[in-house]
Amino acid sequence: QRSLVGSEMCIRDRIQIVQLHGTDKKLYELVAPLVMSPEVLKQNYNYPFRTSEEYEWFVALDNKHVVGFVPVEHKKYECVINNYYIKERNVDTLKLLLEKVLEKQGEESSLTAVSFVEDRDVFSELGFLEDKVWTRYVKMKKNR
C-alpha cells in the first residue's frame, strides 16, 4: 500500500462521505442547491442530473458543505457512474468518492463509468479500463 501525500491525508481527515438512496429526502436537501446551480450545470456541460429508486448517491461533505457527489445507477447487469460533480474538479475528492463507491460495490457486478476526459487518470489509477473515448467523455469499465 502506498503512503498518502500531505494534501491527501488532510482531505481524508476533513471529508466525510455519506451514502444515500436515490429518493432519500436528505439527498434532495444536500444536492438540490448544486444540481440547479448554473455553475455546476456548466461544469456538467449543461446535462441535467437525475435520480430514481435505482440510484445510490455518494456525497462528499467538508464541514457540512457538499464538495462533490457520485450517483451510481444499479441496472440489471451492471452499475453505472454518470454525471458526477466535484467542486473545483478536486482530484483528491473524486478519488475519495470513487474509493468509497468501489468499497461498497464489492463483487456485486461490473461497474461502468462515463468520466470527463480530464478525470480519466483518476479512474485508471483505481483500475478502470478505457472502453470508448469521445470528445468530452471516456467510457471506462471496472470488472469484478
Regions found by a protein language model. Give the residues of each.
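Conserved active-site alpha-helix within GNAT-family acetyltransferase domains
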Residues: F116-T135
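Active-site rim helix/loop that mediates acceptor-substrate recognition in acyltransferases
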Residues: S37-W57, L61
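Short amphipathic alpha-helix that is part of the acyltransferase structural core
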Residues: R12-N44
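Conserved acetyl-CoA binding element of GNAT-fold acetyltransferases
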Residues: E73-R89
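Conserved GNAT acetyl-CoA-binding A-motif
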Residues: Q105-V117
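Conserved beta-strand in the GNAT
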Residues: V59, K64-E73, V80
